[in-house]
């Protein structure tokens, strides 16, 4: 009898814990925000009221027990940034163009079109640009092309390879002007004297 009671208790606990959906996994309800709203009081969860941190029955930031969002319809994360222009054109033949600008200076544009089929099928070439301002005030502007050979960005903020030393450039130029007969390792049998300048 005790074994049946123990198994039944374990099953009830398991079913009870499985049936509860934690609020951190739920999306906010439409029209409600995370911070609560004016007049939601301090009777529910974290962040109820007008910027307060309510202490009540189990809600995340709402106005009642178990509520998730607040009642004020506010949004978190600062001011909303307007989209000042938006264009999206899809011509149906595979070519397209889109662009947008926002109120805080972010802009992007891209156009693309299919090209003649290559060995792997139809290739689409895209060209575009985007720009934005970093938190420290630096303007970032990037242009790019993307095709069957990859993504090719250009911008003054991108790192560049270090310059090739003069000695290496002279060596490369010498090798271009004086190619070897085979272009591969010859086992030390080339050059004058048979030892290629090595002294044994």
Curated annotation (Swiss-Prot):
The lineage of its organism: Eukaryota, Metazoa, Ecdysozoa, Arthropoda, Hexapoda. Residues 93-162 form the Chitin-binding type R&R domain. The keyword Signal applies. Keywords: Cuticle, Signal. InterPro entries: CHIT_BIND_RR_consensus, Cuticle_Struct_Prot, Insect_cuticle. Residues 1-18 form the signal peptide. This is Pupal cuticle protein 20. Component of the pupal abdominal endocuticle. May have important role in the larval cuticle structure.
